[in-house]
Amino acid sequence: MDAYLEEEFYDILTYCIENPNASDLESKKQRVSIIGKELHADGGADAMENMFYSIEFRIKDELGRDAQQYRSWWNNISDEWKY
């Protein structure tokens, strides 16, 4: 399950980075939040951190961009996650 979520998460963040003015960003943000909730339910804040770190690294390596600003999309899922 995590592999599917990771690929979907990567695709969504890549889309958001490459299309910052797209009209569907709010729906993308909502899906990212759902992915974060699923990860948290499965493995807590550690699972969230591991997934985001992996995605950040891939985006930096493949696109040369920084995805850190999107960490805030998972705020309010866990008391441990505050960005």
Description of each model-found segment:
Residues 1-13, 25-31:
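Short amphipathic alpha-helical heptad-repeat segments
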Residues 14-26, 43-45:
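Charged, low-complexity interaction regions
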Residues 32, 39-40, 60, 70:
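Compositionally biased, low-complexity repeat tracts
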